[in-house]
Regions:
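Membrane-embedded helix-loop-helix hairpins and adjacent transmembrane boundary segments
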Residues: 1-500
Length: 500
């Protein structure tokens, strides 16, 4: 009986999200009858600043925010926290660099997805289809890993099995994403972001109490592990790791399609500006507090890593169990579950839009076979359900290499879209051959570098992927011509202002 009571907070939270999504489905019925694709995939471009900020922050945060990151901080110390500071500017970068421009372009060409924008800019179905394949492949790998990570944490903190946790939040997120669409995902993401912040605050209080207070914890760390107070952690946090992580989880994240699409969905400039401010504060609070909790947990889990299963992923689950009562541990589990489902819901919706909107509807359009609004609705809902259930099924018995595959995802998406978006939106001379070479060549190079553990100057493979992707872009671009003037007027209207 007590075990059931321990998971009631998490179950109640999931049911609230499901109810919100069902409510949004009902209130959006009229808009979906007019243009289902626009309302379902980007919420009809009606997001306000607060929801835009929270959904972007929640999408960026994942189960690693609660498990992997703090676990590494337990080993390295404040050096990992200093590295994590770069993540504070992530939302400011995404919305600041791409937000306004991509919103104006999307309204001009009636784009619903990032791939719509790329297709209109480069006039290449091959590039658009390649982008769709990249998105679906990497997103599915990420979603499986998110499910696996959260379910394992659920199993460690509660008395319930891995499958129970996976089923409880896995199926609910598939259902509420399917019925709520983008607007439902955005609003529930906002709820998830709030839940994550509250969970981190409770966990921080529990950690401090269990460790005897901040002064006692820091006294132990400074005496027993003084290296944890140093920026380089006596070699465990080299400069090359700082540079690699600042690129991987900082600068290059501005090109992640699941974040960029948020720039298509807001209602006005005021919402964008508010989101940049609110989002920066929220992502900063979540990332830095979570990482700091990992550092101070060293004062609670004082044994060697071999005492905790020889894995940093076990640190936070064990710390939660040792720091909190079963009930509060059940409340805390809402945080990582919220981080998981907010990420999965966004990736799931983006994946289904890539299949239905970017590939299938485009093929039909080329054949002059227009789909009815009802057909679009059925195909979109069907794709979301099928993808979601597929990810859930794989997560039940995940392949042993899934964590290695997940490592590809973040850097792979950045390598694929970084230069394609940057040059596409800010360099008039960029053409489809450069974009195809950068995306295809960059992803292949990055994946090969990851598989064979190839590094340059001990930097993460993202540096090699991004660097050679840039080279591929320039080489490919030299074989093509600049796009037509009509396209340039849409994407670079400032170049033609003198003619008015």
């Amino acid at each position: 009986m007590s075990s059931i009571l321990n998971i009631l907070p998490a179950l109640a939270f999931l049911l609230i999200l499901l109810s919100i999504s069902a409510y949004i489905q009902r209130t959006s019925k009229e808009n979906r009858q007019k243009d289902f694709a626009k309302d379902y995939f980007i919420g009809g471009r009606t997001l306000g600043g607060f929801v835009l900020a929270m959904t972007t922050a929640a999408t960026y945060s994942s189960v690693s925010t609660f498990v992997g990151g703090p676990g590494v901080a337990w080993v390295i110390g404040y050096g990992w926290l200093y590295m994590a500071i770069v993540q504070v500017v992530v939302i400011f970068l995404v919305l600041g660099v791409f937000g306004k421009k991509i919103a104006l372009i999307a309204r001009e060409i009636d784009a619903v997805t990032v791939i719509d924008v790329l297709r209109a800019r480069y006039h290449s179905d091959f590039l658009a289809n390649m982008a769709a394949v990249v998105i679906v492949a990497f997103f599915c790998a990420t979603m499986v890993a998110q499910f696996v990570g959260a379910a394992k944490l659920f199993e460690a903190v509660t008395d319930f099995s891995y499958l129970t946790g996976l089923t409880m939040f896995g199926l609910i997120v598939v259902i509420y994403t399917t019925i709520g669409g983008f607007k439902g995902v955005a609003v529930t993401d906002a709820c998830c972001a709030i839940a994550m912040i509250v969970g981190l605050c409770i966990l921080m209080g529990g950690m401090m109490h269990a460790g005897g207070g901040f002064n006692k914890i820091m006294s132990y760390i400074s005496t027993q592990h003084p290296d944890m107070l140093e920026p380089l952690s006596r070699g465990k946090m080299p400069i090359s790791l700082y540079i690699s992580q600042w690129l991987l989880v900082g600068i290059c994240t501005l090109s992640l399609p699941q974040s960029v699409v948020r720039g298509i969905s807001y209602k006005d400039t005021k919402a964008l500006h508010n989101a940049m401010i609110i989002g920066t504060v929220v992502i900063g609070a979540m990332t830095l507090v979570a990482t700091w909790i990992g550092v101070i947990s060293k004062g609670i889990l004082t044994g060697p890593i071999t005492a905790y299963g020889n894995s940093v992923d076990n640190i936070m689950p064990i710390a939660i169990v040792q720091s909190l009562t079963p009930f509060w541990a059940g409340v805390i589990i809402i945080g990582p579950i919220a981080a998981t489902i907010s990420t999965v819901s966004s990736l799931l919706l983006s994946s289904s839009s890539s299949i239905v909107k970017d590939v299938y509807m485009n093929i039909k359009g080329k054949r002059e076979e227009q789909l009815s609004n009802n057909q679009i609705r059925l195909y979109s809902l069907g794709a979301t359900i099928i993808l979601g259930l597929l990810v859930y099924a794989i997560a039940i018995k995940p392949p042993s290499v899934i964590w290695q595959i997940n490592m590809f995802a973040f850097g792979g998406l950045e390598t694929a879209f970084f230069w394609v978006l940057i040059f596409g939106l800010f360099w008039p001379k960029a053409n489809k051959y450069g974009a195809i070479a950068a995306m295809g060549g960059g992803v292949i190079i990055y994946c090969l570098a990851m598989v064979f553990k190839i590094k340059v100057l001990d930097l993460h493979q993202i540096v090699l992927g991004i660097g050679l992707s840039l080279l591929c872009f320039f080489i490919g671009n030299s074989f093509g011509k600049t796009v037509d003037e009509k396209t340039l007027r849409i994407f670079f209207p400032e170049k033609f202002d003198d003619e008015k």
